[in-house]
């Protein structure tokens, strides 16, 4: 592969990242440094890139875009937190009934990467009471260029292999006055509405 040779002599676009294979994304990811903790600040749009399996892709796209309640737009970060146990925190952006809403919060810190042990920017969802926290979702963020980050998403006990996505921005400042329409995810589980009507594997529901 020659992906790492391309980094210094070009500006990447989201479309170019989408055209890379899973193996090429992994090679590229391993070659990158972490984003600096204090510099990832504000709201970013996001695009899913690749999943390790076809089943993972189908389930992932249904979870993010097909539950009938929301459409995932991206993430937002602040390098500080009112909670002394967190170094930083953030939220996910969704479009619901034509409006942008914020939920699925996370805590952020620097930690050893699950991929190669390098120090990396990490998002942990388990400190908050939301679905992503219930499956112990952990994301990592690495710096590709000034407006673009390459990221992995993991969940469940096995964690690996990860999903790949990218973040581009920041496009807006962090919204410190978010209203948390489904609950603040601190004392009680967030009540995000969803439907299983479009679940991609309906035969599995019959066996429950």
What does each model-found stretch correspond to?
Residues 2-208:
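Soluble ligand-binding/transfer domains with enclosed cavities or grooves
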């Amino acid at each position: 592969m020659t992906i790492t040779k391309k980094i210094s002599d070009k500006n990447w676009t989201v479309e170019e990242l989408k055209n890379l294979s899973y193996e090429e994304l992994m090679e590229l990811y391993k070659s990158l440094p972490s984003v600096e903790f204090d510099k990832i600040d504000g709201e970013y749009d996001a695009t899913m890139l690749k999943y390790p399996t076809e089943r993972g892709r189908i389930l992932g796209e249904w979870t993010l875009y097909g539950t009938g309640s929301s459409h995932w737009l991206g993430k937002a970060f602040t390098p500080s937190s009112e909670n002394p146990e967190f170094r930083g925190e953030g939220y996910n952006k969704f479009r619901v009934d034509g409006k942008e809403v914020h939920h699925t919060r996370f805590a952020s810190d620097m930690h050893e990467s699950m991929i190669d042990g390098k120090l990396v920017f990490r998002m942990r969802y388990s400190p908050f009471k939301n679905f992503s926290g219930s499956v112990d979702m952990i994301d990592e963020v690495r710096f590709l260029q000034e407006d673009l980050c390459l990221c992995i998403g993991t969940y469940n006990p096995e964690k690996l292999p990860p999903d790949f996505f990218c973040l581009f921005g920041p496009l807006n400042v962090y919204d410190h006055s978010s209203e948390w329409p489904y609950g603040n995810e601190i004392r009680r589980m967030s009540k995000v509405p969803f439907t299983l009507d479009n679940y991609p594997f309906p035969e599995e529901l019959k066996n429950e």
